[in-house]
Amino acid sequence: MAIIKKFRIKSFKNKNSVVEFENISLSYGNRLILDNLNFKINEGQIFGMLGPNGVGKSTIFNLITGLINPNNGKIKITGQNVTGYPIYLRTKKFKLGYVPQYGGFFNDLTLHDNLKAISEIVIKNKVYRSEKVNYLISKFELDNLKDIKAKFLSGGQKKKLVIALSLLGEPKVLLLDECFAALDVLTIKMLQETIVNLQSESKITICICDHQARDLLACVDEAMILSNGKIVAQDTPSNLVNNINAKNAYFGDNFKFN
């Protein structure tokens, strides 16, 4: 039995949408991956996508960034139709940040040198570049790890590093792909707090995809559940756990909220 004791409670009814899918469908050959998806991610929201592995969550991220394009439908970012925009133009113009499930850093560079290397690509001003690197190391409480090679960091420390790397470009939208996967309970809690604090302080829009309901729902404002290429439910976490479609598709009857 999974028990969640507290949900975030925030309203986004009057906020502008940052990412919007309109009638998006995608097929690979004869296999239908996404079937007429319609949803919005609002400004300043922590939005979650929940579903089993292979349901299309990472595919949605690839569509948002422009790595792939849909067969049908429109993708809008801040109200502008970006369907067909190449990935480099889309990520730069709309300031999209992406944190992959695996990797995203240089194994044989120290934590500090990872940040320094990427900062030299995305930040022109040398003084600000150094300040930004030091700020992120301090913000994520990585000071005592900055001289350790990335390959020797723990799972949670690597996640913090990759998130810090993604923030060097000062994104307005941050996509986190399976960020809780293969982490222990205490590390997951730490990462949840990091994500919530990041949004609260920077007002960034964050979208997380994951396959574990208890991990995702504890830190998002709204979530949608995917099954067989469709959205079967979308609501606040507290409403989702009581949604019959969500229970039938994903939670089961033993998922409770106290």
Segments (PLM) and residue ranges:
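Conserved structural motif at the start of ABC-family nucleotide-binding domains
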Residues: V19-F21, L34
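Conserved ABC ATPase "signature" region
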Residues: V127-L145, V196
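Q-loop/switch helix immediately C-terminal to the Walker
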Residues: Y102, L109-E120
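The feature captures the beta-strand-to-loop junction immediately N-terminal to the Walker
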Residues: L50-P52
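ABC ATPase NBD coupling module
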Residues: V82-G97, Y102, L240-I244
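Conserved ABC ATPase signature
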Residues: K149-L153
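Helix-to-loop junction immediately C-terminal to a conserved catalytic motif
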Residues: T65
